[in-house]
Design a protein with these regions (language model features):
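A residue-level marker of the well-folded mature domains of exported/periplasmic proteins
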Residues: 21-194
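Sec-dependent bacterial lipoprotein signal peptides
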Residues: 1-19
């Protein structure tokens, strides 16, 4: 429940930032924002949609929502970014599947004049104006500290990183204090959200 409230807040906050909430805006002027997420099937991102739709209504924004069905399909994300540019979006709110493979598409959108806001998982681009999400490095440290506080004696950890191609997955793993919590093994599963 807490994660869903956070998702709704992220969606609303991202759109509010883009519209310059509180600034003077002609009531007839509608700005166009594309929300491109990791998966349209994810419960988390469905909550983001709810927040984004509420903010779009409140701030008179034209909102398009798109994303691949699974969280592995960065090629579809790149195509959707290009489609948003062609459709005349003024901004993209984006959650990257692959921080490196999505970078060129985000750079191209920014060069076309779009504002870029990333949520949940950013992209390897200096064109991102705002990131809204968790401090994933600190979250990794907190998780490791919680384990270390509860266990005495030798400890061997198996690291299962949900997706090493995402910025948030990499940062959470980097937050693990390696000397005091050595990894006995490391895996990155691939699974579908269906």
């Amino acid at each position: 429940m807490r994660r869903n409230r956070r998702a709704v807040l992220w969606g609303a906050l991202a759109l509010a930032l883009l519209c310059g909430c509180g600034g003077e805006q002609d009531a007839s002027q509608r700005h166009s924002v594309a929300l491109v997420v990791k998966s349209t099937q994810s419960e988390f991102f469905r909550s983001v949609f709810a927040g984004a739709e509420a903010a779009a209504a409140e701030y008179n924004l034209e909102l398009s929502i798109a994303g691949p069905e699974t969280e592995e399909d960065y090629e579809t994300q790149n195509r959707l970014i290009a489609e948003a540019v062609r459709a005349g979006a003024e901004a993209i709110v984006f959650s990257a599947i692959d921080q490196e493979e999505n970078a060129a598409a985000i750079d191209a959108a920014a060069q076309a004049g779009l504002q870029i806001v990333t949520i949940d998982s950013s992209v390897d681009s200096d064109q991102v104006s705002t990131y809204i999400g968790t401090d994933n490095y600190a979250a990794g440290q907190m998780a490791a500290d919680a384990v270390l506080d509860r266990v005495s004696g030798p400890l061997y950890v198996g690291v299962v990183n949900y997706d090493v191609s995402t910025a948030n997955g990499q940062e959470r793993e980097r937050g693990r204090p390696t000397p005091s919590l050595p990894a006995a093994g490391r895996r990155s599963p691939r699974w579908s959200t269906h």
